[in-house]
C-alpha cells in the first residue's frame, strides 16, 4: 500500500524457492523514478523453532506501526537474542537479517537505463568496484538478463555493530 499511494504500480511477481521468498516489483509511471522490489519470507516454510522466534518478534510490534508513513524504513520493533538470530541464520539469511535490522532497505541496485556515460552494466560494476564498493556476487555480479527483462547488480552494505537484547556484535 505504501508504494501504491506514491503512484507506483505492481508489475512483476517472483518466487525465489531456495530462499523461501516471494517478491513483487513496483514501477512508477515516471520512468526516472526507481523500480522497487519488495520481498516476503514464507515463514510457514521454516522450522517450528524459527516460526516461534518470528512470531515472538511480530508480537512485540505495535499494530499501528504498519500504517505509519515511515514504516518501510522504521527499523527494528522487537528484541531478539544473539542465539535467536543464530537460529534464524541457520535457516534463512533473510530471516536473520530482518531480525537484526528490521524494516529498511536491504540493498540498492544500479539502473543503467538512465546513464549517459555507459549503457553496459559491466562498465558500471567496474566503476563501482574502482570506487571501493563491494558488489553482491551471490549468483554472479549480474543477476537476471534479457529473458526476465531485468539485469541488475547490487552493492553490499558496510559492516556495522548489531545490538541484540543480550549482546552487541
Residue ranges, per PLM feature:
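The feature marks the mature, well-folded catalytic cores of soluble enzymes
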Residues: 2-6
Amino acid at each position: 500500500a505504501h508504494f501504491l499511494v506514491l503512484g507506483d504500480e505492481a508489475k512483476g511477481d517472483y518466487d525465489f524457492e531456495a530462499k523461501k521468498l516471494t517478491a513483487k516489483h513496483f514501477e512508477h509511471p515516471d520512468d526516472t523514478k526507481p523500480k522497487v522490489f519488495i520481498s516476503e519470507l514464507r515463514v510457514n516454510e521454516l522450522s517450528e523453532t524459527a516460526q516461534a522466534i518470528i512470531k515472538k518478534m511480530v508480537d512485540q510490534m505495535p499494530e499501528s506501526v504498519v500504517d505509519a508513513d515511515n514504516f518501510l524504513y522504521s527499523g527494528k520493533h522487537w528484541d531478539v537474542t544473539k542465539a535467536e538470530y543464530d537460529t534464524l541464520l541457520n535457516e534463512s539469511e533473510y530471516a536473520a537479517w530482518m531480525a537484526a535490522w528490521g524494516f529498511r532497505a536491504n540493498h540498492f541496485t544500479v539502473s543503467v537505463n538512465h546513464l549517459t556515460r555507459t549503457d553496459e552494466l559491466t562498465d558500471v560494476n567496474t566503476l563501482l568496484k574502482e570506487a571501493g564498493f563491494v558488489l553482491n556476487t551471490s549468483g554472479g555480479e549480474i543477476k537476471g538478463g534479457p529473458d526476465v527483462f531485468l539485469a541488475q547488480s547490487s552493492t553490499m552494505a558496510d559492516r556495522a555493530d548489531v545490538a541484540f537484547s543480550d549482546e552487541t556484535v
